[in-house]
C-alpha cells in the first residue's frame, strides 16, 4: 500500500506538474505521449509488439521516476467498448480454446476502477464446451452486478481448475481483460462452487499474487492431493497467509460435509490464516444458503482489499518452474533433497531479513515506494549479512515485470538475485 510519505510526495509532484504545465506546455505533451505509449505497451500481446513498445517507452521517458509514474497512472481506457454479457476465448499455445463469459456493467465508466470477480463453476468432468456459455447453468442474469466486472471461465475433463493449463489460462484471461477495462488491481477476487470451490483452493495455495481474497463454496482442498484427479499436490498452509478466505460448506453435503472439511479449518486456525468458515446447518451440496449469506460475503470483500506488497511474506514451494512466487519474493533454486523450500521475508525500511530453508537461491523484487534507493539496501539471510549496497533502478526491469503482471500496484524497478549462504 502507498505510504503516507509517498502520498505527500505525490501531492507535491502533482503541484509541481501543474506549475510546470502553466510555464512549459511541452511537459504536458510529454505526459500525453507517455499515456499513449503505456496504452500501446498494455495492449501489446505479440513478442514483437511488446519489444517495440518497451523500447519506445525507454526512449521516451527522461528518467525511471517518470516511467514509473506513467505506469502507475496506467493506460488510457476507452468508453467505446463492449458492455453487458460478452464472450471470448483465450487460445493456448497448443491451439486449445479456453472460453469465458464476462459481464460488464451497462453503465461502465472507463474513468472508474472496477472490482473484478471470477466465478468458477462446478461439474468439471464433462466434455469440452462449445461456445455459448452453457458451462454456467444457472443463467448469467443472477451474476450481473452494476459495481463490478464478473468473469465466468469454462472447465472440462481435460482442463480441471487445478490442472496446469488452467493455472496458465486464468491469469491470462485476467490480463486480457485488464488490457481494455479499468480493473481495480487490489479488488480482484476468486469465487467457486463445488469443483470450482476446489479450484479456488488451488489458486490460493499455488498462485495467490494477483488475488485479494478467495471464496470457496462447497469444495474441498483435499481433492488437490489426489493424484488420480490430476492434482497430487502437496499443500502448504503457510502459503495462505496474507490472502483471506471465505469458506462455506453444508453439514449434510453428500460430497464434502462439514465434518470432512473441519480438519483443514483447524489447520487454518493453527497457522493463523485469516478466514471465515460458515457451516450451514442441515445444508446439502447446493447454494440455497447464498441469499442469506450474501450480505456477509459482500462485506468480507469490502473489508479485504489486497495488500500487494506486504511487509512480511512467506512462501513454500516444491518446484521452481512454476508456483514459486508470492508477491515480491520468488524461490529460484531448491536444495534438491525432496524437502520443500520455505522462504520467509520481512521488510523494515531498507533492511530485509530472510529465513530460507531448503533453498539455494531466491529473488527479491523491489518497489520504489517501499525502499529508498538513495540509501544502501541490506539483506540478512539466516542471520548472515548477505548483501549491502546502493541498488540501481533499471527501466527494463520495471517494464519486464509490468509486462508480466499488468498490475499498477506490482511495479518493480530492481530485482535482487541472491544465494543462500552455507
Where do the model's predicted regions map?
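Bacterial N-terminal signal peptides
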Residues: 13-24
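A domain-start/cap signature at the N-terminus of enzymes
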Residues: 29-114, 385, 393-411, 422
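Gly/Ser-rich "nucleophile elbow"/oxyanion-hole loop immediately N-terminal to the catalytic nucleophile
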Residues: 106-112, 159-195, 205-211
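Active-site machinery of serine-nucleophile hydrolases
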Residues: 116, 120-179
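Primarily recognizes the serine-hydrolase "nucleophile elbow" in alpha/beta-hydrolase
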Residues: 186-239
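Short beta-strand/loop motif that positions the catalytic acidic residue
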Residues: 240, 246-249
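C-terminal catalytic histidine-bearing segment of alpha/beta-hydrolase fold enzymes
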Residues: 254, 258-352, 357-358
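C-terminal beta-sandwich/jelly-roll accessory domains of carbohydrate-active enzymes
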Residues: 316-422
